[in-house]
Amino acid sequence: MAQLIIEQPGMPPITVSIDENEVCLGRAEDNDVALTAEEVSRHHAKIGRRQGRVLLTDLKSLNGTYVNRQRIVERLLSDKDE
């Protein structure tokens, strides 16, 4: 099963398992994973499965979503992406 490891300054890493359900990320409490960084939008991104692969989608966040230092709108993830 795929896992997402979320690192936030001053906090221990959060490990999220990616199964068949979408996982919503953002500052708002109604997200599956609530993040604390001020640069994170209330509803920032979602991650889920598409055809057996892991897909990360930005939810029109103000500061953007980045994979390997490149801003993305939507991207299929690979092992070791950051």
Predicted feature locations:
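Forkhead-associated
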Residues: 2-8, 12-82
